[in-house]
Amino acid sequence: MPKEKYEPPDPRRMYTIMSSEEAANGKKSHWAELEISGKVRSLSSSLWSLTHLTALHLSDNSLSCIPSDIAKLHNLVYLDLSHNQIQSLPAELGNMVSLRELHLNYNQLRVLPFELGKLFQLQTLSLKGNPLTQDILNLCLEPDGTRRLLNYLLDNLSVSTEQPPPRSWIMLQEPDRTRPTALFSVMCYNVLCDKYATRQLYGYCPSWALNWDYRKKAIIQEILSCNADIISLQEVETEQYYSFFLVELKERGYNGFFSPKSRARTMSEQERKHVDGCAIFFKTEKFTLVQKHTVEFNQLAMANSEGSEAMLNRVMTKDNIGVAVLLELRKELIEMSSGKPHLGTEKQLILVANAHMHWDPEYSDVKLVQTMMFLSEVKNIIDKASRSLKSSVLGECGTIPLVLCADLNSLPDSGVVEYLSTGGVETNHKDFKELRYNESLTNFSCNGKNGMTNGRITHGFKLKSAYENGLMPYTNYTFDFKGIIDYIFYSKPQLNTLAILGPLDHHWLVENNISGCPHPLIPSDHFSLFAQLELLLPFLPQVNGIHLPGRR
């Protein structure tokens, strides 16, 4: 950060005075810079209404203080307050996070507010000729002095923000009381791997709040507070899975399965510890593990390239993975849901899948192909399990239900989400970027090889998102990007969503000027998803032509 190239104002400022004739003819003035000079002692309050300004030149005046209202000029990228008599700066100056240059030379500043450390996009901070303390001046003289000083200020800024209010629990529908059901809850959470939590990416967060030892406490607290029956995590570091997450969650009755990204297989044991991957945990009192699977997208791309250069050069080079566990519901879960003894003899299985797709917005084609690969493999897993375990597990719906959790790195209007939620996508969808994938994509049709119909690749699931209709305005919240990229999908008609955990209070974020996460009070750049699902169970055999749903 910052990612956009900054063009400083032209020092040769040109002034054009509009003639009365131009004004009479309706000519509009467009100006984004303002200079005020002439030994001005105070500033008019009307100045703070000029929120369109990007540069403000206030040097060579007689200003002794700057009002806190200056923070209303939120579009400023350049502010020059040099050669004044300013003795102190308002803390609110730290909220002007668009600033790239701040010139404070030759004033009477003895201290700087720690809030200045929040100006993470600042490239130049000029402080010559001020009676500042020696440690501040020494920091300024070091290589990359501005960055070092800002880091020092931010790391020493006390956190006065109160904890966010609890996220609301949103009921969507009542459980089906007319038939046997099993209720269980699912969490999906990208925990932000330590190696990605850098000041370069998250310059607005103090270094101590990016530290994994600090963040992991809040992460595990959030996970445990939800008390989900199934937990799907992305960006879990290999070493942290075994030494932290598995240890903490096993103590609370969970078992888990984890796979690192494909690059781990070529690394030394020491390097492998820091590779992130996907994990699924489940409560052993409610589920029994039947099978576990890892899906490596680069291996699938290599095996199914069919001569496609895009498949080899774009998809195969990305090492994202997915994992899946086939779980059997324990009798106790069914009895807890129904409040009655479970008298059925059939096994009830469910497949839980978790994936993390490639991140780069320029690779929408890769995300879409990875999603197709994953769903194809999930379908294969379900089909094989159904055949090997025979009809005793299928019930009246004819297939094993699916819960799919993922950081898809794709917005709701993307080809990825269209593919999942509508059952298919056109082979000429814009997200393929007109690259040649057609021959290889037929291999991933969930309707079997050559399963394309009318130029559309389809899959055999009926998937629905637990968070529909804008229930969450964003699941990823950084300074540069705010949007929905995390999802919980489930298969219909066997599964329904009864309730979900709502979004973090938007007013809390705005009122506390939180421009991005992580934050000292929010440990990841993602917000967790949490849903209560209802699984419709097969009716017990008929007695005199009447179904007995769990003998209720």
Curated annotation (Swiss-Prot):
It comes from the Eukaryota. One of its GO terms (cellular component) is cytoplasm. GO terms for molecular function: 3'-5'-RNA exonuclease activity; metal ion binding; poly(A)-specific ribonuclease activity; RNA binding; RNA exonuclease activity; transcription coactivator activity. One of its GO terms (biological process) is miRNA-mediated gene silencing by mRNA destabilization. LRR repeats lie at residues 52-73, 75-96, 98-120, 121-143. Mg(2+) 1 binds at residue 235. Keywords: Activator, Cytoplasm, Exonuclease, Hydrolase, Leucine-rich repeat, Magnesium, Metal-binding, Nuclease, Nucleus, Repeat, RNA-binding, RNA-mediated gene silencing, Transcription, Transcription regulation, Translation regulation. It is found in: Cytoplasm; Nucleus. The active site is at 407 (proton donor/acceptor). Its cofactor is Mg(2+). Poly(A) nuclease involved in mRNA decay. Has 3'-5' RNase activity. The CCR4-NOT complex functions as a general transcription regulation complex. Enhances ligand-dependent transcriptional activity of nuclear hormone receptors. Subunit of the CCR4-NOT core complex. Belongs to the CCR4/nocturin family. This is CCR4-NOT transcription complex subunit 6. It comes from Xenopus laevis (African clawed frog). The gene is cnot6.
